[in-house]
């Protein structure tokens, strides 16, 4: 029994050390650190919950990974495809906008107020590393990827996720704002407007 007790205690300590969750009102902040060999994976997630309308959640995700000191220095100082991809992809930033509806949605435009002239790309949501290197401001994915399903209506709630990948350059710009004001425009020309406190500074993301 003692061995089982101490085993469970160690598991609890491990989880507390690697998992941090902070919740206040309609906001959830979550940080997870995982280690695999010499690689450390770090995910920080900020979730803003909306009470009204079809837009239910705004989720901001910062993803990073750290190699061993020697491998890190090698990639930071070397040239070529892999070192360039390593530098371009660390850290990674993205917004996930989650909608509930009785149909599949597509979004043709995402506008950050104050940056209406931002350069927007529309690659597939799973961006290969070579496209990461060319990412200008942000990527909203292919708005017509599920076009053949747009006319269908379902007798249940469909969870739609719009993923917007942010470049490091654009992240530095929006981090300076006092408030995040974002307009999402669906393929049916319906607008979803967001106006919230800029959490990027508050949580040091």
Curated annotation (Swiss-Prot):
Residues 1-23 form the signal peptide. Keywords: Cell outer membrane, Membrane, Plasmid, Signal, Virulence. GO terms for cellular component: cell outer membrane. The keyword Transcription does not apply. The gene is bptA. Belongs to the BptA family. Virulence-associated protein essential for survival of the bacterium within the tick host and therefore within the natural life cycle of the Lyme disease spirochete. This is Protein BptA. It is found in: Cell outer membrane. Its main location: membrane. Pfam families: BPTA (PF17044).
